[in-house]
Amino acid sequence: MEQEKRIFSIDWAGRPLVVEIGQLAKQANGAVLVRYGDTVVLNTATASKEAKNVDFFPLTVNYEERLYAVGKIPGGFIKREGRPSEKAILASRLIDRPIRPLFAEGFRNEVQIVSMVMSVDQDCSPEMAALFGASLALTISDIPFEGPIAGVTVGRVDGEFVINPTVEQSEKSDIHLVVAGTKDAINMVEAGADEVPEEVILEAIMFGHEEVKRLIAFQEEIAAQVGKEKMEVVLYELDPQLEAEIRQLAEEDIKRAVQVPEKLARDAAIEEVKASVIAKYEEQEADEETLKQVNEILHKLVKEEVRRLITEEKIRPDGRKIDEIRPLSSEVGVLPRTHGSGLFTRGQTQVLSVCTLGALGDVQILDGLGIEETKRFMHHYNFPPFSVGETGPMRGPGRREIGHGALGERALEPVVPSEKEFPYTIRLVSEVLESNGSTSQASICASTLAMMDAGVPIKAPVAGIAMGLVKNDDNYTILTDIQGIEDHLGDMDFKVAGTAKGVTALQMDIKIKGLSREILEEALQQAKKGRMEILEHMMQTIREPRKELSKYAPKILTMQINPEKIREVIGPSGKQINKIIDETGVKIDIEQDGTIFISSVNEAMNQKAKQIIEDIVREVEVGQIYLGKVKRIEKFGAFVELFNGKDGLVHISELAEERVGRVEDVVSIGDEILVKVMEIDKQGRVNLSRKAVLRDKKEKKGKRPERHRMKP
């Protein structure tokens, strides 16, 4: 039977939010078309009928960009969308993170959410429409989702918070924050800010959560009318009898193993206990399912003991205090031929960041749905398998690496000098050499050091720290500088980066259903204390950016010309500019306002290129005398080059004061002669005279200075 199309609407930050259900994608478990202004996103939620034989919840979120949404045809030879853009990957992660905690423990059915962006109004965020639509598609479906959730963007313009700021408002905003959650609590935060105090960030989060509650009420109203009955699923459970056996067998050994301070030794101790228990069951010829359960029960025991130690005894696996940072070390100038490098080590987490400076022509070209076309500041994060002592394939960046790179970029961007102040493209690459948690924050610290070593005049150094949480009912403990095991077995990964003045980036992921204001406030203040300690350490390594760039970095010379002269500098089909580049070996970037950036490692070549361009755009002035070179001789006169690209004609009658029979009697090709500009005609032709120069000289010579007699 044909399902009836239903339409629901609400005002969202001054723009209409319209939801259509029942017409499109009806074979999915849940499907919602969201119209937010002129932004249109089709959201579907689909689940497998049977549970998968895996030890995790198999959720996949795909945020699919279609370039037709902004009236573009994809570039390149193939002319169709390929792998997801960086922005699409970040949007997929943004949707995944608040939704994932809201499925029951033990739910192992595969779930896929697809958000297909079909039309984009730049003032109505497709990411926010997709987040809303993904939650609603799950809520009205028969998939056992414990939502709904919603998310909003919060900006701050002239001291006032704004929900879902427009493009114009975003340009003026000093906060760019996304907050998501349920009606009772916050479960995801993603933010960039211009050194904003923690108190303001907290208020922005709570302001956004009020709007989240309103959107959730709207979803509940829709679900009450069109929602399906939830499917019955069998949740994966551990065998209680087997669990009791293993507790008796291994609990004491695990308690000792998790308190080994050093990561590799601790991992080895835990693995030894696990191997011993599994070997006993293998001797009993236990089947594959039993062995799988044995492994999961052992993991559960490790998790319980780590959490118990932290919440009850305030003891961490490596013996640190709750708010203690691991030992820090850092250095700069590690690599001799790079433009700048910084090595930052925190415990067993180590990152080497390298800064490379390029010309403005080296900017990244963006081919996506946003209004930005280029990017001059980039931060790339790499996580090779050897960093955790493992082998593995060396592929291109995955979702996690792209996400960590973007977080670092967002944290550092507020302190990067403007194009006008520092006309360079800046690329940072963070290589994770050792990992035991908080690598994304270590990459921020190492990148700050690398930029300072490169001589980038950053406004202030930035440091990052990751906070953790272990929560059992009402009893909770916030951890400073979490390591891998605390991240893996804890309830929160709360990353905060900033300067001494305030926060520049923030990212919060949790595994529980939500957090209260009190926990958020405490975590932010504890993070600030830790950040200040790390900044103090970094300042001991390098106090300020180097005054001079590396000798291997390009030197950029800036000049300004009349915009109407740009065509002359470029020349037909780029002939003129390519000639300058070939002759000098420089890179030349020209802005529409006539600003020209000339860059090369050789400063002398920069000056040579500048002189050539100045000659091209230089105007010939009537009445001025120039030293020119004879380039061509005709019967009627000589063509003289005044400067590069500018010729004029000295008619035979203007070559000398006396009558000239043949031009060659007075000048030859290659001669340098003084000429005066007599006229520039309507066609732009320049008429020159040598005779006028000779006459002027004669007149000056003929003038005698007046003699004044002394009075008696």
Swiss-Prot record:
One of its GO terms (cellular component) is cytosol. Pfam families: KH_1, PNPase, RNase_PH, RNase_PH_C, S1. The keyword NAD does not apply. Its main location: cytoplasm. Mg(2+) binds at D487, D493. GO terms for biological process: mRNA catabolic process; RNA processing. Its cofactor is Mg(2+). It is found in: Cytoplasm. Keywords: Cytoplasm, Magnesium, Metal-binding, Nucleotidyltransferase, RNA-binding, Transferase. Residues 554-613 form the KH domain. Its EC number is 2.7.7.8. It catalyses: RNA(n+1) + phosphate = RNA(n) + a ribonucleoside 5'-diphosphate. Residues 623-691 form the S1 motif domain. Signal peptide: none annotated. InterPro entries: ExoRNase_PH_dom1, ExoRNase_PH_dom2, ExoRNase_PH_dom2_sf, KH_dom, KH_dom_type_1, KH_dom_type_1_sf, NA-bd_OB-fold, PNPase. CDD domains: KH-I_PNPase (cd02393), RNase_PH_PNPase_1 (cd11363), RNase_PH_PNPase_2 (cd11364), S1_PNPase (cd04472). GO terms for molecular function: 3'-5'-RNA exonuclease activity; magnesium ion binding; polyribonucleotide nucleotidyltransferase activity; RNA binding. Involved in mRNA degradation. Catalyzes the phosphorolysis of single-stranded polyribonucleotides processively in the 3'- to 5'-direction. Belongs to the polyribonucleotide nucleotidyltransferase family. NCBIfam families: polynuc_phos, PRK11824.1. PANTHER family: POLYRIBONUCLEOTIDE NUCLEOTIDYLTRANSFERASE, POLYRIBONUCLEOTIDE NUCLEOTIDYLTRANSFERASE 1, MITOCHONDRIAL. This is Polyribonucleotide nucleotidyltransferase. It comes from Geobacillus sp. (strain WCH70). The lineage of its organism: Bacteria, Bacillati, Bacillota, Bacilli, Bacillales. The gene is pnp.
